[in-house]
């Protein structure tokens, strides 16, 4: 099935910094898997300090050739309750790659991306456009004249499982609610709003013309008190997020009842789906993580691989989102296939997703 997928969300420059050990002591809980906004503090030196409001600091000895930043980055909020003091880690390697959930979903779904960039002469915007071209992603952009493109410092502990994207934002946040209207009149099989501010996502998902509507939030969407996710949950056919994001949402039970399908992923613990069966009964399915015989190389993009494979499987098997119900067997089939896709992407350290044929082979 060839889906006409339209993805509204960011494409970032991801400056990926891989480190040699967990970002928090294992005794304090599972690996970090959340995004946080940051601001540059004092610059200079050989190390990079990530400091949250509670005073917890991760000090990173930077690898050879690191292009910056160095010095201190102030995180907007704490990254783990109970974490105090300093933790020293060493940078192993770094790379610049294409990032952003919009770019990820557009690639995984073979869809068209609609995103915001800075002006034509903005260096980061130029790099992002080049990376989109290199990945052969079809895209259209809104140029924001007075903001540089958004970018991310992504700190990954690789096999230890931490993924801490630190965002330097402003470009997409500057958009008006109707900025994407020229494209919202186009009919499509699937419309995805990925990691955009809630006020933008609500406008995109409530517009007519899409057979299926997916919301892929970031942590900031769950924390948004000015525009609650519950206020537009009725416009969402599939909401897919990780457990830490889900548990941050204050009115999550209201949201769970208003979306057609909720999927919560939990890394090596597997995933949970909540939905309504054709008999009108509430359905719940848990599926374990797909078995692996080696540690992950990188956990970045596992969530996008899972959600994109899950929804494409449902639609290819004839699910009708307008009905508001779905058969349990179909949900289980889609979750198993999605778990395999997420497991395969753990072997990648670069931008990309497993082909359907690779998923088929893994499931044999």
Where are the model-predicted features located?
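Conserved phosphate-binding/catalytic region of the ribokinase-like
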Residues: 1-19, 33-37, 49-52, 252-364
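Hydrophobic anchor at the start of a short beta-strand
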Residues: 5, 111-112, 139, 212-214, ...
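Short beta-strand/turn micro-motifs composed of small residues
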Residues: 9, 115-118, 217, 266
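Short Gly/aromatic-enriched secondary-structure transition segments
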Residues: 20-29
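Substrate-binding N-lobe of the ribokinase-like
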Residues: 35-151, 344, 362-363
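Short acidic-glycine loop/turn motifs at beta-strand connectors
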Residues: 110, 157-160, 274-281
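Conserved phosphate-binding/catalytic loop of the ribokinase/pfkB sugar-kinase fold
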Residues: 113, 143-144, 152-199
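Conserved beta-alpha-beta core of the PfkB/ribokinase-like small-molecule kinase fold
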Residues: 188-261, 267-278
């Amino acid at each position: 099935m060839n889906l006409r997928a339209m993805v509204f969300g960011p494409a970032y420059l991801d400056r990926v910094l891989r480190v040699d050990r967990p970002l928090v002591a294992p005794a304090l809980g599972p690996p970090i898997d959340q995004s946080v906004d940051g601001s540059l503090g004092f610059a200079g030196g050989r190390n990079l300090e990530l400091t949250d409001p509670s005073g917890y600091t991760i000090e990173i000895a930077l690898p050879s050739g690191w292009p910056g930043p160095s010095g201190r980055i102030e995180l907007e909020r704490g990254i783990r309750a109970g974490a105090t003091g300093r933790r020293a880690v060493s940078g192993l390697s770094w790379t610049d790659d294409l990032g952003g959930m919009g770019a990820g979903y557009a690639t995984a779904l073979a869809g068209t991306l609609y995103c915001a960039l800075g002006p034509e002469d903005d260096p980061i915007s130029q790099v992002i456009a080049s990376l989109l071209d290199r990945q052969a992603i079809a895209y259209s952009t809104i140029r924001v004249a007075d903001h540089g493109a958004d970018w991310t410092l992504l700190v990954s502990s690789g096999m230890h499982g931490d993924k801490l994207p630190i965002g330097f934002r402003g470009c997409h946040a500057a958009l008006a609610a109707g900025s994407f209207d020229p494209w919202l009149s186009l009919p499509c099989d699937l419309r995805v709003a990925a990691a955009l501010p809630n006020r933008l996502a609500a406008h995109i998902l409530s517009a007519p013309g899409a057979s299926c509507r997916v919301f892929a939030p970031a942590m900031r969407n769950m924390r948004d008190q000015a525009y609650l996710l519950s206020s537009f949950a009725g416009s969402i056919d599939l909401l897919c997020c990780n457990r830490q994001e889900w548990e941050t949402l204050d009115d999550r039970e209201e949201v769970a009842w208003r979306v057609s399908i909720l999927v919560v992923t939990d890394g090596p613990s597997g995933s949970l789906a909540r939905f309504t069966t054709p008999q009108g009964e509430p359905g719940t399915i848990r599926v374990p993580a797909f078995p692996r015989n080696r540690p992950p190389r990188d956990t970045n993009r596992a969530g996008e691989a899972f959600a994109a494979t899950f929804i494409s499987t449902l639609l290819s098997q004839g699910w009708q989102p307008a009905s508001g119900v779905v058969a349990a067997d179909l949900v289980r089939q889609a979750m198993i296939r999605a778990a395999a896709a997420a497991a395969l992407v753990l072997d990648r350290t670069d931008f990309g997703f497993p082909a359907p044929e690779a998923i088929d082979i893994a499931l044999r």
